[in-house]
Swiss-Prot record:
It comes from Pyrococcus horikoshii (strain ATCC 700860 / DSM 12428 / JCM 9974 / NBRC 100139 / OT-3). InterPro entries: Acnase/IPM_dHydase_lsu_aba_1/3, Acoase/IPM_deHydtase_lsu_aba, Aconitase_4Fe-4S_BS, Aconitase_4Fe-4S_dom, HAcnase/IPMdehydase_lsu_prok, IPM_dehydratase_rel_enz. This is 3-isopropylmalate dehydratase large subunit. Binds 1 [4Fe-4S] cluster per subunit. It is an enzyme of class 4 (lyase). It comes from the Archaea. Its EC number is 4.2.1.33. Heterodimer of LeuC and LeuD. Keywords: 4Fe-4S, Amino-acid biosynthesis, Branched-chain amino acid biosynthesis, Iron, Iron-sulfur, Leucine biosynthesis, Lyase, Metal-binding. GO terms for biological process: L-leucine biosynthetic process. SUPFAM superfamilies: Aconitase iron-sulfur domain.
């Protein structure tokens, strides 16, 4: 059986109804969830959490009023609200909520991040999340699974983001709709494992999980992925599937670098960027977005905040930052950013004429020093 089949206790293609162990949403999706919930339900029957991470603190009166509405709804229904502590997917991990769960539904497309912990986690739209809140359960068609088996070890300049840009690019002509990605023989750290499952959504995967031993049964596709020969990658505008070796875009001038997000804002990511920036000065706007308060505190304890500030970087409060183009570093017309986020669609981080290149924290940090896309090969 695949990992998905084991958790859902059903074969791929079957339609099942399952209890949901945890449902969560954030300030960006919760208003529509509340609207749908109030049309049908009077009480919450699910274990639920709300996180303020997308546009926090509120930058406008409109956003402030929406957040006020969320607080009032949560108070009425006894739902904990976590404000200003970081990105929802990171906090669910840090708070131990994922460890106590088998099936998780989130009001965000990157909920499958939790699959790094062996959880069947899926993002759903507002109506489906509202139903989970009201019933404590959901229906699912058990997805088929694609197995990714890693071979070899990554080089010192290769990070999980490089792996995923290459994998997503290789799958762009393969129909991943409503299929799961399952990773085996994974040589990455806990922080980097979360990058693998988080980025899987950009391959159009329904969810993603990390397993231990690959048994080869019931998988519709098997991908052997050699790590030792993989170098730094960059995804060109305007798709994460536009991946190329960094050398092919080296020298591209950039206006801004963003290192953070639910993809690459964990401690290891920022520490490795700081190792590059130590004693140097950035050549372009460089924004650092810790994924959580705990990440930020550790940055303070280990002197990383001083390194980044001395290098000329701007450190944001924990949260999503400019990833979704709402505040704290949005792009102007025709500006170019090198970002460690997971999406580079037109207009994603601000102006629709801006260009977004995606890369690992290492590539982003080195590029910040030179003001152009640069391979980290000689700097690490």
């Amino acid at each position: 059986m695949t990992l998905v089949e084991e958790i859902l206790d059903a074969k791929a293609g079957e339609v099942v109804i399952r209890n949901v162990d945890l449902v969560y949403a954030h300030d960006g999706t919760m208003p529509l969830i509340i609207e749908a919930f109030n049309k049908v339900f009077n009480s919450v029957k699910a274990r639920a959490y709300v996180f303020f991470d997308h546009v926090y603190p509120a930058p406008t009166v409109k956003v402030a009023n929406l957040q006020k509405e969320i607080r009032e709804f949560a108070r009425r229904h006894g739902i904990p609200v976590v404000e200003g502590k970081g990105i929802s997917h990171q906090l669910v991990v840090e708070m131990g909520l994922a460890e106590k769960s088998r099936i998780v539904v989130g009001g965000d497309s990157h909920t499958p991040t939790l699959g790094a912990l062996g959880v069947f986690a899926v993002g759903m739209g507002a109506t489906d999340v509202a139903v989970v809140l009201g019933l404590g359960k959901t229906w699912l068609r058990v997805p088929e699974s694609v197995a990714v088996i890693f071979e070899g070890k990554p080089s010192r300049t290769t990070m999980a983001a490089d792996v995923m840009i290459r994998l997503i690019t290789s799958l762009r002509n393969y129909d991943m709709n409503y299929k799961a990605l399952e990773f085996f023989n994974v040589p990455f750290t806990a922080d980097e494992r979360l990058t693998l499952t988080n980025f899987s959504v950009e391959a159009n995967a329904k969810t993603a999980l990390i397993g231990e031993e690959y048994d080869g049964r019931n998988y519709i596709k098997e991908i052997s992925f050699e790590l030792s020969s993989l170098g730094p990658m960059v995804a060109k505008p305007f798709s994460p599937a536009n991946g190329v070796e960094v050398e092919k875009v080296e020298g591209t001038k950039i206006d801004q670098v963003f290192i953070g997000s639910c993809t690459n804002g964990r401690f290891e990511h920022i520490k490795r960027a700081a190792e590059i920036l130590k004693g140097e000065e950035v050549a372009v706007r460089t924004i650092i977005g810790p994924a959580s308060v705990n990440v930020y505190k550790r940055m303070v304890r280990e002197g990383i905040v001083d390194i980044l500030l001395d290098a000329g970087a701007t450190i944001l409060p924990p949260g999503c930052g400019p990833c979704l183009g709402r505040h704290m570093g949005v792009l102007g017309d025709k500006e170019v950013v090198l970002s460690t986020t997971n999406r580079n669609f037109r207009g994603r981080m601000g102006s629709p004429t801006a260009e977004i290149y995606l890369a690992s924290p290492l590539t982003a940090a080195v590029s910040a020093l030179y003001g152009e896309i640069t391979s980290p090969g000689g700097e690490v």
